[in-house]
Amino acid sequence: MNFGNIVCFNRVFDKNEIRNLISWFLSNYGSIRTKELLDKMKNFGFTYATTTGLSLGLGDLKIPSSKANLVKSSEKILFKTRNRYKNGMINFINVLDEERDIWNVVNENLKKESINNLRQSDFLNPLYSMTLSGARGSITQVKQLIGMRGLMSDSQGNVIPFPIKTNFKEGLNITEYFVSCYGARKGLIDTALKTANAGYLTRRMIYTAQNLIVKRSDCFTKYNTCVLLQNQDKEELKFLKEKLIGRVLAKTIVNAKTGDILVSAGQDICNYTFKKIINFPEVYIRTPFNCVLMEGICQICYGWNLACGKMVELGECVGILAAQSIGEPGTQLTMRTFHTGGVFSAKAKEVITSPLNGKIWYDLNTGLRRVYNKFKEKAFLTLQEKKIVIYENDVSKSIMFLPSSTLLYVKPGRKIFDKQIIGESVNSNLKNDVFGIEEIRDVKAKISGQIFFPQINSKQFGKIFWIISSIIMSFTSLFFHLTKKFSFKNKLICPTTNVHKKELFVNRKKELFPRKFGKLFINIRNVNSLVDKSKVLKKRSSHIITCILDQDKVIMLRNLKKQKRIFGNFKIGCFLKTGQIISNFKLLHSSQIIQERKEFSIFRKVMPFSTNDDTLMRIEDKPFIRKNQLLYRVNFVREKTYDIVQGLPKVEKLLEARMTSSLKEIINNPHDILTESFFTFLDDYENLVAARKSFEVIQKYLIDGVQTVYKSQGVKIADKHIELIVKQITSKVIVTNPGDSSFMVGDFLDLNLVEVLNKRLVNSIVYEPIIMGLTRFSLSSQSFIAQASFQETTRVLTKAALQGRADWLSGLKENLVLGNIIPAGTGFKN
């Protein structure tokens, strides 16, 4: 809204909105008026902070009403998952994955619900005001107060498979409290020990980049970097805008239809310019990688000073600025892990939840395909946009349109509750890159018996094999009512429902060897209920037989009506799953029908196992196997908490260009990628072009790797800061043939220097590109004073004295050590 000269923003101003306002004001009105605005905002803030106050009480912690339903439905889903595991449909890795995914989704939904609940019901809630304004605390902490703590990680970062379902307002039980202590310990350890690592990484980067000072306005390089703009989605365009604003164009952009020049080469890209070039397929820009100055960097290749949105000034220490920009978030985030207290955080999959209680309806006949998800759960895959209607009391209350490639888990006509998960995006169901440790887990037999591989393996469920338990003994006898306490002589334990489970019966007229039998029965605990004497009548019409094998391994059922086929279509030798109801009996274990007679049938206990392609089998078909003997080994990734404490070693590994980790060679390490790229390009290009192109490949790899770590923690670092550090460690080549030069084989030279020298030599220098890690680069500095102040002081100074080296005092460090004016800022002009 615009009322004359008054600009009105009708929205809540949190931290980000204030940042956007100041940025907009600065670019439109300049720095002097922005300074006045900031003064007014400061006075306004302090005035109201003085006259108002916030107090936080237990009544302000409002738990979302949907929490109980969410937790209950998640437990039901996991119960079904464990049953599928018992029936051999999935393996234990699928169980672990689904448990982690389910609790992550519940946690994420509760976090959103907590905020929405406060936003809708109590807008002036102190907790909401403090957190959402960005003044104090984070949503993660609010979630723990009024949502649930969720999965925790121990001091090594491993996920503890026991979720804390309560929050701090409800209070934790004993078990949850002790699990919670693991996380608190992790926070303390990280704060105490890992902060030093973050600080040391900053120091090494500063030593590497301290010579990068803006020395000239232009280096007149012929190199440039191409950025593709076409076929990008909204997220990509937002990312590209951040990448391009503040850069300088290397090539003029012309309107193809009119021939008019839209943007000239050498012009910096601002918001206005970006709107002009957004419809072009590609643009060419200058980056620090393109700069060909021997020392420092030029203004055009660097671009804007992002602090003020103007071209960087001559004499600016952009190298140290870059090192601090990368190092500081690492230090801050390491200390911040203390406050979150070891809560396991991973990206939750994108799920679709019901907006209300009611019944779901959609057309089953069009645009759907029956599929299984990665946990072998039945689902419908939408092949096109699907209309979903939710009814409450037979009245249509909500209509949703699901995009194609969505998995639906609820059938039409089923009752659903508010916030129930009814589907998920297929992209989230694909296997994500998981941060964790690859492990090989041994799977052992839980019972003794014979291995059996069915002829046909299901496409949906992979390979399934069974362990068939072996019969040890069989006996029968009749028991009557229980009349004496804890006596098993002539007693009957009978069922209380039509579905019989966990009962103990024997047949009549057979000798039992009372002592051995009694001893065996003491160990059996599968007793459901004992019947009161007054309520039980003597019953001889039903005879049910239990054959004991290694404590209840084989079950024999006798039917009083003496039907010929008591189990319908089940044949001898077929396998039955846990929970199946057979002639009013619910099977407690997976079983195989091994004998069927006129009066009874015999079942043998079996145990199914599911395997996949990563399984290393240790058994063959039909051998006998003992309890606890190795069945197979399976590879899986044990997920760990991914916070900055795990991220910083990754940044360090990339910037130090490590080849080994824990005495093992790193597969696809930067050195291997660079060498492979160089020799591939060398087939088509000359030495210089091949070296530059292979450096481009590794530079992109390193920048993406570092950005991934910081983006996962929600930290934005401008690409140009990382580019400056990466430029330093990818600027050297190793001489393989000195040609007409005075250099030796194995000497390290700057690529820009070699390019200049080769233009003057008849027999050119032949070389290969190399990566120097931060430490190695600092120790190969031209200044021996800077080298000595970093590490190995005695060795560096002794070697410099023996070689008679001269130090030209061109960098910051050497001038600082000797007390001279540093060649930056006002010292640069002098």
Curated annotation (Swiss-Prot):
<dbReference type="InterPro" id="IPR007083">
    <property type="entry name" value="RNA_pol_Rpb1_4"/>
</dbReference>
<dbReference type="InterPro" id="IPR042102">
    <property type="entry name" value="RNA_pol_Rpb1_3_sf"/>
</dbReference>
<keyword id="KW-0548">Nucleotidyltransferase</keyword>
<dbReference type="GO" id="GO:0006351">
    <property type="term" value="P:DNA-templated transcription"/>
</dbReference>
<keyword id="KW-0479">Metal-binding</keyword>
<keyword id="KW-0808">Transferase</keyword>
<dbReference type="Pfam" id="PF04998">
    <property type="entry name" value="RNA_pol_Rpb1_5"/>
</dbReference>
<dbReference type="InterPro" id="IPR045867">
    <property type="entry name" value="DNA-dir_RpoC_beta_prime"/>
</dbReference>
<dbReference type="GO" id="GO:0000428">
    <property type="term" value="C:DNA-directed RNA polymerase complex"/>
</dbReference>
<dbReference type="InterPro" id="IPR007081">
    <property type="entry name" value="RNA_pol_Rpb1_5"/>
</dbReference>
<feature type="binding site">
    <location>
        <position position="301"/>
    </location>
    <ligand>
        <name>Zn(2+)</name>
    </ligand>
</feature>
<keyword id="KW-0804">Transcription</keyword>
<feature type="binding site">
    <location>
        <position position="291"/>
    </location>
    <ligand>
        <name>Zn(2+)</name>
    </ligand>
</feature>
<dbReference type="GO" id="GO:0003899">
    <property type="term" value="F:DNA-directed RNA polymerase activity"/>
</dbReference>
<keyword id="KW-0862">Zinc</keyword>
<protein>
    <recommendedName>
        <fullName>DNA-directed RNA polymerase subunit beta''</fullName>
        <ecNumber>2.7.7.6</ecNumber>
    </recommendedName>
</protein>
<dbReference type="GO" id="GO:0005739">
    <property type="term" value="C:mitochondrion"/>
</dbReference>
<feature type="binding site">
    <location>
        <position position="219"/>
    </location>
    <ligand>
        <name>Zn(2+)</name>
    </ligand>
</feature>
<comment type="function">
    <text>DNA-dependent RNA polymerase catalyzes the transcription of DNA into RNA using the four ribonucleoside triphosphates as substrates.</text>
</comment>
<dbReference type="Pfam" id="PF05000">
    <property type="entry name" value="RNA_pol_Rpb1_4"/>
</dbReference>
<keyword id="KW-0240">DNA-directed RNA polymerase</keyword>
<keyword id="KW-0934">Plastid</keyword>
<dbReference type="GO" id="GO:0009507">
    <property type="term" value="C:chloroplast"/>
</dbReference>
<dbReference type="InterPro" id="IPR038120">
    <property type="entry name" value="Rpb1_funnel_sf"/>
</dbReference>
<keyword id="KW-0150">Chloroplast</keyword>
<dbReference type="GO" id="GO:0003677">
    <property type="term" value="F:DNA binding"/>
</dbReference>
<comment type="subunit">
    <text>In plastids the minimal PEP RNA polymerase catalytic core is composed of four subunits: alpha, beta, beta', and beta''. When a (nuclear-encoded) sigma factor is associated with the core the holoenzyme is formed, which can initiate transcription.</text>
</comment>
<dbReference type="GO" id="GO:0046872">
    <property type="term" value="F:metal ion binding"/>
</dbReference>
<comment type="similarity">
    <text>Belongs to the RNA polymerase beta' chain family. RpoC2 subfamily.</text>
</comment>
<feature type="binding site">
    <location>
        <position position="298"/>
    </location>
    <ligand>
        <name>Zn(2+)</name>
    </ligand>
</feature>
